[in-house]
Amino acid sequence: NMNELLLVLDFGGQYKELIARSVRANSVYSEIWPGNTGAEKIRELNPIGIILTGGPHSVYMPDSPKCDPKIFELGIPVLGICYGMQLMCHMLGGKVQPCEKSEYGRVKAHLKTESPLFMDIPEQNTVLMSHTDLVAELPEAFIKTAETANCPNAACENPVRKLYGVQFHPEVQHTDNGRKIIGNFLFEICGAKGDYRLDDYIETQIKKIREKVGNERVLLALSGGVDSSVCAALLSRAIPGQLTCIFVDHGFMRYREGDE
């Protein structure tokens, strides 16, 4: 794959697919990898940037998932979202503690628009918050770039090291201008070209399928769900005449849909 790559490191957040998708919607290819992927492996993958996802844990608990601390030394821009921001701040010497008042839902945030992350975004911007912990003290050399009524450090950055964090969720529709915030990270901070198209992905997958299948035949159980339908569509383009689909009626179709 010759496209530039944005790496999404997963810490168990429910929105990881949305993060990957909003990156791709900005024409940058993204892949989701486990949160504890080693810095050496990441250097090998050579991404233009890294996003740390949210997650249900508390960073100060001993069994909470951590990333390799060396990823902050690679010189690759990092954006921590929610748990990702707390994790970055915690690992770099900041202080994370429980909120006096948990924030859930749409909240008005006051943004410092001179931050490259918030370029061309209104100073007052409604964002989606969903957290029970907050960053009480930022690590050394980090500056605060956003606040809400209940969260003094709603975003932060260390521009010299290209480390950025947001406590809110820019990847969801409930955050105004969220896709633009992710776009700013990609284009203003990571220097992305935006060279990814879905057609490229289809071509890549078709090539992979042909290499794997060769002259063999493929038997596919097709339920009519998204996964097996997409798989069938790709296979029929990649290896026409080598594919046999068997319809699996699992009893969850609409009335008579299976017969149609």
Features from the language model and the residues they span:
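Gly/Ala-rich beta-loop-alpha elbow adjacent to hydrolase catalytic centers
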Residues: 80, 84, 89
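RNA-binding accessory domains that recognize and position tRNA/RNA substrates
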Residues: 1-49, 56-62, 66, 72-74, ...
